[in-house]
């Protein structure tokens, strides 16, 4: 299939030869782990070049040096938990990690609910006065948005640019190459990714999105409300059962 795409599609479109993987913005660990073919690398580079062109006409978040920040915070071999987000915060407060914000920004509503659920389920957890989740990532929590860029003030504005194939590839690669990871899928868009995950070798947890809108909804959904889902306790129990060090959620 890859050869056919290369011959029939890619050869007929303008593309740039890749002489160094640095242009992909990914950490070396992730380049080696994903083992993307030359065709897929060119496809990713084309997407990144598209983002550069869009920056000439609009404000795009996050900056180039933060698009793949998740890959520098959490090496593939260290992954224990995967938490999927939708797209970066469109107000510019994102850091390149799903749900996380830099220290100088206020804590967004969805992250406040994440902290609330942690306080409810873990008596040792005390909500911090910031929303930086870097310490989770360095413990092995992959905080991955399924769309990696966004235009200022326009939520999900880059959903049709082509990020989905790349993040789907990441999710399926983690599922295939690793074992006994916990996938936390919150909200419809994240839950749709469950088809990419082998539930026979990983724990897949599903709940409604932690946003206040979902929390306030009176509609009876297929999945449990986020508040009360107990995902953080379930994750650590599973990790301990499989001889892995649990995540210190309180370490922020």
Curated annotation (Swiss-Prot):
GO cellular component terms, A-Z: host cell nucleus
Primary location group: host cell
Per the record's keyword annotation, is DNA damage included, yes or no?
yes
State the top-level EC class.
Answer: hydrolase
Q: EC number(s)?
A: 3.2.2.27
Cited InterPro entries: UDG_fam1, Ura-DNA_Glyclase_AS, Uracil-DNA_glycosylase-like, Uracil-DNA_glycosylase-like_sf
Q: Where in the cell is it found?
A: Host nucleus
Enzymatic reactions:
Hydrolyzes single-stranded DNA or mismatched double-stranded DNA and polynucleotides, releasing free uracil
Q: Which residues form the active site?
A: 87
| Signal peptide coordinates | none
Q: Which UniProt keywords apply?
A: DNA damage, DNA repair, Host nucleus, Hydrolase
Q: What the protein does?
A: Excises uracil residues from the DNA which can arise as a result of misincorporation of dUMP residues by DNA polymerase or deamination of cytosines. Therefore may reduce deleterious uracil incorporation into the viral genome, particularly in terminally differentiated cells which lack DNA repair enzymes.
NCBIfam families given in the database record: PRK05254.1-1 (NF003588), PRK05254.1-2 (NF003589), PRK05254.1-5 (NF003592), ung (TIGR00628)
Name listed for the protein in its UniProt record: Uracil-DNA glycosylase
Query: What organism, scientifically named, is this protein from?
Result: Saimiriine herpesvirus 2 (strain 11)
What lineage is this protein's organism placed in?
A: Viruses, Duplodnaviria, Heunggongvirae, Peploviricota, Herviviricetes
